[in-house]
Amino acid sequence: MEHLHTTICALATPPGEGGIATVRVSGPDAYGIVGKIFAPVRQWKSVADAKGYTAMLGRYLLNGAEMDECVALFFRAPHSYTGEDVIELSVHGGTAMADGLLEALITAGCAPAGPGEFTRRALENGRMSLTQAEAVMEVIAANGRQGAALAKSALDGRLAKRIGKIQTALQTLNAHLTAWVDYPEEDVPELSDAAFVGTLTEQKAALDALISGYSAGAVLRHGVDCVLLGRPNVGKSTLLNLLAGFDRAIVTPVAGTTRDIVEQAVQLGSVRLNLFDTAGVREVGADGDAIEAEGIRRSWRKLDEAGLVLAVFDAAQPLSDDDLELARRCQGRPAIAVLNKQDLAGETDVPRGTLEPYFKKIVPMCARDAVGLQALTDAVADLLGTAQLDPEAAQLCSARQLAAATRARDALAEAIAARQNGFGLDAAAVCLTDALQALFDLTGENASDATIEEVFETFCVGK
């Protein structure tokens, strides 16, 4: 960043109306600049003498005029978020007072902070690792408590520690291997195949566990797009209203009431579902309703875009050709068959065996009476993998981390295969070096400037 070593300021709270607005100041001259625009209520106090982890009440000055009441929180380097001197100034919420405070600080010598610049300085000053820095935005953007807990575990350094253990084991192995290859005269004991392959296999398994949990972790943090599909009048809108907790969609006995997509975000257990209630899917002839036909085309498009499909069937009626077409289109997708209107169903109306080849889960329900809701909640969590995920455990929290972990895992797999296929230790050592490089990229120890810029370009100003 252009002014990494200047003193910067930015609004740290959301802009607009609110109880308070907080402006963060960080840098070598933070106390000097704030001292120019902050007048303590107790005049014998001064900003320059303020100790870390203390607060002071005063008013901020703009062009020499007292403006709003202001509370200053002081942090001394290196015991601050950025590792620098930091002061956080809180005034009444709203744009006027916050903008005035920013103007006063910039006039006094502050530079406006860029996106993520405070966290970038924390990284540069050793206050956090790159994986922790990435977790900052994940905590902010997390949907639901478990998603926030998952992101918080990375922010607390659990991911960095877990990767560190893998690195240490591989570095120890690599050092032994290097010594044996490069210094044969030193009588370094040769690694046995069992010890070499065993260590690689153990660390590959650790990476496999991290990689396999990524998708479920992403669901907990960000939610998943979920489409409700089914032929007309099977109860899709009733199910939407049940999940939403209020009448979001119009429900009538008339088939085809929903003609366009209805969107609603809901929390189902630990998972946030971005629901899309769609027009009933059925075969429409060439001379059919053009509006309905367009709604059906949009429904099928949503099927291709969704991360979860709830295919709704009328359990009180035999499966129609339209039902079977829907089932076929759901095959191979993360799809759950919801057998709705179970209260009206006979024993043989919808044979489960007909649907089982196409769906991961089948859930009987009566959406009108909220019967089967817990079973649906459990099925969604199990299908998406969130039921097996420990939100307190270390997890990968970005696509960049996933790519690096995958490269490391694949390199270890190649090293194992090299030994099993009779190649020498020197060939396996090349793969081991590649794995270590990928792990260094993951943690940021050897990350390029381009990688770091990529991480911080997604940050908001003030963080």
Language-model features and meaning:
Residues 1-149, 153, 336:
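A glycine-rich (often HGG/GG-containing) alpha/beta subdomain
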Residues 91, 251-252, 296, 313, ...:
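Hydrophobic alpha-helical scaffolding
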Residues 2-15, 145-267, 273, 286-287, ...:
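C-terminal-of-GTPase-core extension/linker across diverse P-loop GTPases
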Residues 56-67, 72-76, 256-287, 305:
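Switch I (G2) and immediately adjacent beta-strands of P-loop GTPase domains
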Residues 292-316:
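Inter-motif core of Ras-like GTPase G domains
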Residues 26, 91-93, 243, 278, ...:
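Glycine-rich, N-terminal phosphate-binding loop of Rossmann-like dinucleotide-binding domains
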Residues 275, 310-312, 338:
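Structural motif
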Residues 17-20, 28, 84, 94-95, ...:
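Gly/Ser/Thr-rich helix-start
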